[in-house]
């Protein structure tokens, strides 16, 4: 534990934390950083002013009327008139490259390059910047100097971002229109091969390049700011915990106060047995030490059972208010000890309760209106500290309430108590959990079983909640899973694999995603799943309507018909009567959806209708209002759908998993809503996800998201998700897991949030199985949520996997590979390769319910994105060596500051098309300091993450020994997809499916932990568990025998990793 500072006052109680205050060196560094930012701001302001003056002076009135941009000769004349020296001065003054890049781009582009685009003038840019709401940067926690710098730099981004916005809006409209239509049934062969559009673009997307450059710069800025930032500022939780550590001062002795212990001391033998740590001696002088070392238990001379404070008698296990600092609410704790210290001070030990404001979901950081927490609710913790008895303020009546009570019974139970608690809270992994049943609400080995109010009477007064489920031993059916924002199904697939390893079957019963190709992929690999290609908010409306229909036509519990149905049934005698020519008879209802599949402009409940006497090509979507004259068809459809479980009903879902997209937090976007991220439409899916959880009340919830959810706006969205679960009376636990730690040659860290009904065991996070090459930045505030071993315990980890371990056995393919099914050419070379080639049965994948259609020896999706002619020529000239990239091309010079430039002594080499061999965007990317453009991976390396775009213009994605980008299958291997898992759609869509997926080994490890919890196996109250050795890979004999049909004798030596 990090040492903590001494308290400011002797009488102020302290409670525990793991934070360190800012050092003098850090404060000095921060001051220097602010000064540098101020200087940059002033330089940019002067440069921008001179730029506008030059434009005004050089542009004659009327001469440029109607022109939309400068011609190259105009730019050259202006530069010559002002002199090269002046331009050099401007370059030196511009720390960010946007202005210079835009000048170069404008000088080299022909007027037709932006035909039809609106050119922004300087005054337009200023006007747009002025319209932005003030205080955005300041409210996000930036200093005034940082805010001014961001605002000035942001002016130059307005033009570029405005063009991007238009493109995004068009994409959004197209996507929403596609999603609103009826779900399509796709055949595997419809999108299995390469299409004409599956070719790398001739030039990189300027907006994408700029965004990724800014993101890289943002990472650097975040790392630099963290070096000088005081850990814990601005966080209510950290402020609260910071007050819980410092040892009490011994300036005031017991004789200085009227407060005193009551009665005789506890007999020495009994005291040493109950509190042995207080009397242990590490050295001969331990009893003489006036100040204990940090993390060392304060030593005692003797113990007592009661104390008199302000003429009030306090006993062990009393709940009390404890004096806090100035302008703070009194702390809440439970007395666990009274003792006289070796300094003869009178102390008590207190086990702390946390208010909601003291936790990760503090209302001081999270101001929302869609849910709230009871102000009487507190959470018991394991945190303890020693304080002088004079810090006790008064008693408080706290009731322990059964978390499974109904709201009515809970209200009755807490009506005569000051506060109540039904869960514990721990800062580690931000855990809200049930209290251990064996100690009835007390935590820790020294805590007793007494509580402030008799909760036995409270429990008997009310009715237990309907959330209570039968023990696992009484359940025989396969557990059901709903996968929201499913993508191609990676997370649900991994969860099912891990669940099976724990001895239970979990089936992806339902899945929802807006991407039709991802839905087709999931359906192909999970044929028994009900896969819906629609917006998630429409799915929520649909299941609400479906529940109403089932209540109308079917009784949930016994599947019998309701005694009365509002809509009259048609007379059976009229079935065969001929119909008028202009009337169509409904033969059967095929599907149901909510939305507007017929583009009528009105959302509602629709049925897909098969018309009598017509083939399927005449099927149409009809609103439920238009089917009022055929209620018997609706009844038949609902009865059949209810029996087949086509849609989930409240209380009938075991697990919900999903990764709601929060695109409003991505990138270095100055237009992000720091003050209220939920106001951004791009973050609304998080609310929809929680609304579905609230409606369906599954036993378990697992939400996945990018780590930025815990970085942006002080982790607002992550805190919101946890707050929603706790407000819904779910247990919750937050962790961050990196894919590399679970046996993959990549790092990619993701945030995971467990939720569990109070009647279930809260799942733990599985500890790593492998070492990994650490990349990226962990949010400091949530550093205790990183799932990892302590540094001394890493000896149990396997070696980190490298690129060769994953892909060295795959066949050699060229830049243009049209076949999506080929055969293996060599035997597997590593343990990972042998496992990843296994069939469904050996990997325990039961998505086909026992059948295994895997084609032995067949390899799917081993296709690269085809490079265009220019890029292919460039890639062919990148050397086959470690660390190779565009800097190895002819004509590039690397300066002493690691900045690249063209060699002025030789002519610029050209491609066969006439374009330069070394493109301008590669030289200017990240101010010329990046080594990513046309970078080649190497066998003994790992990748930082698996990308969704396979273009080499600004990322290291070239194969180590072949002149192409990594194939879809190679990327899938890096994500842990078994080779039998087939992707569906155009090549670019397949890259997106793999890149957006949760790494399957991570999901599998989580699934194993979920399976144990589902079985009721808690194994203590630790937040993490160690995976069994047999979990990492299947039994070795089974693996070798079944590796894609290759006999075990032909398995290559594991050390022969590449050709």
UniProtKB/Swiss-Prot annotation:
Region: Disordered, residue numbers: 1-196, 230-272
Sequence ranges of Basic residues compositional bias: 158-167
Organism this protein belongs to: Oryza sativa subsp. japonica (Rice)
SUPFAM superfamilies noted in UniProt: Chromo domain-like (SSF54160), S-adenosyl-L-methionine-dependent methyltransferases (SSF53335)
Protein name: DNA (cytosine-5)-methyltransferase CMT1
Domain Chromo: 584-649
Keywords: DNA-binding, Methyltransferase, Nucleus, S-adenosyl-L-methionine, Transferase
Any Pfam family matching the protein: BAH
The SAM-dependent MTase C5-type domain, residue ranges: 479-1017
Composition bias, Acidic residues: 29-41
Gene: CMT1
Catalytic activity of the protein: a 2'-deoxycytidine in DNA + S-adenosyl-L-methionine = a 5-methyl-2'-deoxycytidine in DNA + S-adenosyl-L-homocysteine + H(+)
Protein's job: Involved in CpXpG DNA methylation. May not play a major role in maintaining CpXpG methylation.
Main location: nucleus
Residue spans of biased composition, Basic and acidic residues class: 42-79, 92-129, 147-157, 252-262
GO biological process, one term: negative regulation of gene expression via chromosomal CpG island methylation
Entries under InterPro entries matching the protein: BAH_dom (IPR001025), BAH_sf (IPR043151), C5-Methyltransferase (IPR050390), C5_DNA_meth_AS (IPR018117), C5_MeTfrase (IPR001525), Chromo-like_dom_sf (IPR016197), Chromo/chromo_shadow_dom (IPR000953), Chromo_domain (IPR023780)
Domain BAH intervals: 312-436
GO MF annotations, alphabetized: chromatin binding; DNA (cytosine-5-)-methyltransferase activity; DNA binding
Effect of a null allele: No visible phenotype under normal growth conditions.
Coiled coil: none
């Amino acid at each position: 534990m990090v040492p903590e500072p001494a308290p400011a006052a002797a009488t102020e109680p302290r409670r525990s934390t793991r934070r360190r205050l800012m050092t003098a060196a850090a404060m000095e560094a921060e001051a220097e950083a602010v000064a540098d930012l101020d200087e940059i701001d002033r330089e940019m302001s002067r440069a921008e002013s001179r730029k506008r003056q030059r434009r005004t002076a050089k542009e004659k009135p009327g001469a440029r009327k109607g022109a939309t941009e400068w011609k190259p000769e105009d730019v050259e004349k202006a530069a010559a008139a002002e002199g090269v020296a002046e331009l050099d001065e401007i370059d030196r003054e511009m720390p960010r490259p946007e202005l210079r890049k835009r000048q170069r781009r404008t000088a080299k582009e022909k007027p037709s390059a932006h035909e039809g685009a609106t050119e922004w003038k300087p005054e337009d840019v200023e006007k747009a910047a002025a319209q932005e709401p003030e205080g955005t940067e300041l409210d996000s926690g930036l200093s005034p100097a940082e805010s001014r710098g961001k605002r000035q730099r942001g002016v130059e981004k307005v033009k570029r971002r405005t063009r991007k916005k238009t493109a995004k809006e068009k994409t959004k409209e197209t996507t929403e229109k596609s999603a609103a239509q009826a779900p399509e049934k796709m055949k595997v062969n419809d999108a299995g091969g390469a299409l004409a559009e599956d070719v790398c673009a001739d030039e990189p997307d300027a907006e994408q390049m700029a965004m990724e450059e800014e993101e890289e710069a943002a990472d650097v800025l975040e790392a630099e700011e963290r070096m000088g930032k005081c850990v814990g500022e601005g966080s209510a939780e950290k402020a609260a915990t910071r007050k819980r550590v410092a040892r009490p001062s011994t300036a005031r002795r017991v004789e200085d106060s009227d407060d005193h212990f009551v009665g005789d001391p506890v007999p020495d033998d009994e005291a040493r047995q109950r509190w042995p740590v207080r009397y242990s001696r590490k050295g001969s002088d331990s009893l003489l030490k006036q100040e204990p070392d940090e993390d060392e238990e304060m030593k005692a001379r003797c113990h007592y059972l009661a104390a008199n404070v302000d003429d009030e008698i306090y006993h062990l296990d009393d709940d009390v208010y404890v004096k806090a600092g100035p302008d703070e609410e009194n702390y809440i704790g439970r007395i666990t000890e009274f003792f006289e210290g070796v300094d003869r001070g009178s102390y008590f030990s207190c086990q702390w309760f946390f208010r909601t404001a003291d936790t990760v979901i503090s209302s001081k950081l999270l101001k929302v209106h869609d849910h709230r927490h009871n102000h009487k609710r507190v959470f018991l913790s394991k945190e303890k500290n020693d304080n002088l008895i004079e810090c006790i303020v008064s008693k408080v009546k706290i009731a322990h309430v059964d978390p499974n009570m109904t709201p009515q019974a809970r209200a009755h139970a807490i009506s005569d108590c000051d506060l109540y608690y039904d869960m514990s809270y721990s800062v580690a992994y931000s855990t809200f959990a049930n209290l251990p049943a064996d100690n009835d609400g007390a935590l820790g080995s020294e805590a007793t079983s007494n509580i402030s109010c008799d909760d036995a009477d409270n429990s008997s007064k009310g009715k237990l909640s309907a959330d209570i489920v039968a023990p696992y031993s009484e359940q025989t059916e396969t557990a059901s899973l709903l996968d929201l924002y499913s993508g191609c199904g990676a997370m649900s697939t991994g969860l099912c694999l891990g669940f099976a390893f724990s001895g239970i079957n979990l089936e992806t019963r339902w899945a929802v995603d807006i991407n039709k190709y991802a839905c087709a992929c999931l359906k192909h690999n999970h044929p028994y799943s009900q896969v819906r290609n629609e917006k998630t908010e429409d799915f929520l409306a649909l299941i609400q309507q479906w529940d109403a229909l089932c209540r109308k036509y079917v009784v949930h519990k016994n599947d019998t018909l309701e005694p009365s149905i509002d809509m009259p049934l048609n007379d059976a005698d009229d079935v065969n009567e001929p119909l008028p020519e202009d009337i169509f008879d409904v033969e059967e209802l095929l599907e149901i959806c909510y939305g507007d599949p017929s583009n009528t402009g009105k959302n509602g409940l629709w049925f897909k209708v098969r018309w009598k006497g017509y083939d399927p090509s005449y099927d149409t979507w009809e609103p439920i209002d238009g089917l009022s004259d055929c209620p018997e068809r609706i009844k038949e459809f609902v009865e059949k759908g209810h029996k087949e479980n086509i849609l989930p009903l409240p209380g009938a879902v075991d697990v919900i998993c999903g990764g709601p997209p929060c695109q409003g937090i991505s990138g270095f976007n100055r237009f992000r809503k720091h003050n209220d991220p939920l106001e951004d439409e791009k973050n609304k899916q998080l609310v929809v996800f929680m609304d579905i959880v609230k409606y369906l009340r599954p036993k378990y919830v697992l939400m996945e998201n990018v780590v930025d959810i815990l970085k942006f706006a002080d982790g607002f969205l992550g805190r919101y998700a946890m707050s929603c679960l706790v407000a819904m009376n779910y247990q919750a636990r937050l962790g961050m897991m990196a894919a590399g730690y679970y046996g993959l040659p990549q790092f990619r860290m993701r945030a995971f949030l467990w939720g569990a009904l109070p009647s279930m065991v809260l799942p733990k996070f599985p500890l790593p199985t492998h070492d990994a090459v650490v990349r990226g930045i962990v949010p400091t505030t949530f550093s205790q949520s990183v799932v990892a071993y302590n540094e001394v315990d890493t000896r149990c980890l396997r070696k980190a996997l490298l690129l060769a371990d994953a892909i060295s056995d795959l066949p050699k393919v060229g830049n243009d590979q049209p076949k999506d099914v080929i055969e293996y050419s060599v035997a597997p070379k590593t343990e990972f390769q042998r496992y990843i080639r296994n069939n469904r049965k050996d990997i325990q994948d039961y998505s086909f319910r026992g059948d295994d259609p895997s084609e032995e020896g067949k390899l799917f999706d081993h296709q690269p994105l085809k490079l265009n002619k220019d890029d292919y020529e460039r890639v062919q000239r990148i050397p086959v060596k470690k660390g190779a990239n565009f800097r190895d091309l002819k004509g590039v010079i690397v300066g002493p500051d690691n900045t690249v430039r063209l060699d002025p002594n030789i002519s610029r080499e050209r491609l066969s098309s006439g374009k330069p061999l070394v493109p301008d965007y590669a030289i200017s990317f990240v101010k010329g300091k990046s080594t990513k453009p046309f970078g080649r991976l190497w066998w003994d390396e790992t990748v930082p993450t698996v990308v969704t775009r396979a273009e080499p213009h600004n990322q290291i994605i070239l194969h180590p020994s072949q002149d192409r980008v990594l194939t879809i299958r190679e990327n899938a291997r890096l994500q842990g997809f078994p080779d039998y898992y087939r992707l569906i759609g155009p090549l670019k869509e397949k890259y997106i499916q793999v890149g957006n997926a949760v790494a399957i080994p991570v999901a599998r490890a989580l699934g194993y932990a979920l399976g144990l919890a589902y079985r009721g196996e808690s194994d203590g109250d630790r937040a993490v568990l160690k995976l069994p050795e047999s979990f990492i890979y299947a039994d070795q004999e089974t693996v070798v025998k079944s590796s894609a049909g290759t006999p075990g004798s032909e398995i290559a030596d594991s050390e022969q990793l590449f050709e």
